[in-house]
Amino acid sequence: MALHDFRTRGFLWAFALGLALSAPAAAETRSYVIEWFSLASSSQDGDCPGGVNLPTREQYFKSFELLGKTPEEAKALMEEFAQGGVKGANVRNMLRMRGRVNGEPTNAFVYPWTVADPQLHAVAGKYGLGFNLDGKQGPNGFQDPVTKEAGVDNQLFRALGCIEQFRGTYDYRPTFWAFIWGSMKETTPAWLFSVDGANLDRDGPVTITFDRAIEHQVFGATGDATADVTYRIDPDPRSHHVFKGEIRNGELSISAPGDLVLLLDTLSFTELRLRQTHLRLKPRANGNLEGVIGGYQPWGDIYFSFAQGGLAYEGMILNDTPGIYYLLKKHADAEPDPNTGQNTAISAAYRIEAVPVFAVPADAAIYKAGGGR
């Protein structure tokens, strides 16, 4: 072999090695399934002036008084309510139709504005989880008990936080969400998100992508999501959203807030819609992520999710559904209607926990071949 052949091969090898050494590190992707989702509550003793709202049965007594019944009449009706049978069914129908238009009964859940406002209590405490969405330090701003950020906008917690079933803390899950999320994760495709970056163990810019899975959440006997399961990404673009993000001091966040839509349960919580979406997640020792997601949410969506269950939801896990309508309307703080001035969106924050999984395209070869993992 001629000398120049060795020199040529040596040059090409050195050139290729130089390219390899100078090329940027390959991107890294980690995917997660959202195993827990609930209102970000931060309840404190004494944060409800006038006390926590009455339990449902006592609230029903008040509902009859608002209809003009005397205390004696209201007591008799509640006794019939407790008896069940035909009399109990008649009382339940009275509660269902406790709205009034021109003196005629109307469905209180479909037309909540036809029911007299029961004046439910709202949170007046100092602390609330979430984000300062508007960059202001207004009188309705909370202080986040975890980050200490001031001016936090979470009017959804203010509106619902004096209803016993919605009370909780960062570590203590509210009763309502333990019930509803525990039910929906069995019947609704899972929510996924992926994080892409040069090195996800270091601070730096990342891309955060939200999707919905084709499969439902896989969980074990304890109810916790199973790690390292493979989910197929639903190609439906309605739940596909990409955000610029960053990792700073080990914390994952969205650096360019935008709109997020995630389809959920078509019969209950139809979808999660957030404007100016913010995110804050920290890793746990087991590899899971936990934190808060928030933004401005149409409060009509929230009311529908409660009202569609009618008297059954109200009696079992809520308090006073028309009363919740009035709370949401009063405390809504964004996107005013141009004709009426009524705010149509409410600032909200949700507590989430996520478990590491694998997320692959729906048409991935492993599934086309009939395989799986």
Report each predicted region and the residues it spans.
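Sec/Tat signal peptide C-region and signal peptidase I cleavage site
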Residues: 23-27
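N-terminal secretory signal peptides that target proteins for export/translocation
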Residues: 1-8
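Bacterial N-terminal signal peptides
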Residues: 10-22
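Extracytosolic secretory-pathway proteins
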Residues: 28-373
